[in-house]
Amino acid sequence: MERFFNTAGPQKPDIHYTIDPLARFDLDDVLMLIRQQKYFVLHAPRQTGKTSCMLALCELLNRQGDYLAVYANVEAGQASRDNVENVIGSTCDTLAERFRQILKSDQPLEIRESTRSLKGDSMLAVFLQRLSEALPKPIVLIIDEIDALVGDSLISVL
């Protein structure tokens, strides 16, 4: 297939003209922030390769083996707007599925089920706590489209 320029979603080097997504930001600085267990934001205009950068970072971290890195897009929570419980539930479901895919195990889904009866933002906190206790490596969450959430929903997820 002939390669072409892509501005609609993650880059696929086999069919898109692309540059190394990890060369688009200071990788050493980002890895230092991760080692220091700090939060950080990758901010750039629309369709500039943020998702491709996040996916590449996730792949790199998993390949290095010190962390379990999981990429999740939480844009689906946008439809629930200020319904915090729906947004938190959707976020937990998304994360559980992404962890299941990476671990090739249903354990994240089972942990998610054990938190379904919890209310509010404690659901997400307890889900992540239980998941981190069950896993042998520290977790790095790479969350895309967090800015799609608004108001109390955004604050609760963060």
Please report, for each region that a protein language model flagged, where it lies by residue:
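Walker A/P-loop-proximal flanking segment of P-loop NTPase domains
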Residues: 1-48, 52-61, 126-131
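Amphipathic helix/helix-loop-helix segment enriched in hydrophobic residues with interspersed Lys/Arg
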Residues: 25, 30-34, 69, 99-115, ...
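The start of beta-strands in P-loop NTPase/AAA+ ATPase cores
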Residues: 38, 68, 139-140
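Switch/connector loops and helix/strand junctions flanking conserved nucleotide-binding motifs
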Residues: 50, 78-82, 151
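Alpha-helical scaffold elements adjacent to nucleotide-binding pockets in ATP/GTP-utilizing enzyme cores
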Residues: 52-57, 86-94, 156-157
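Conserved catalytic segments around the Walker B and adjacent sensor/switch elements
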Residues: 63-79
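Conserved NTP-binding/hydrolysis module of P-loop NTPases
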Residues: 81-105
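Conserved Walker B catalytic segment
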Residues: 115-158
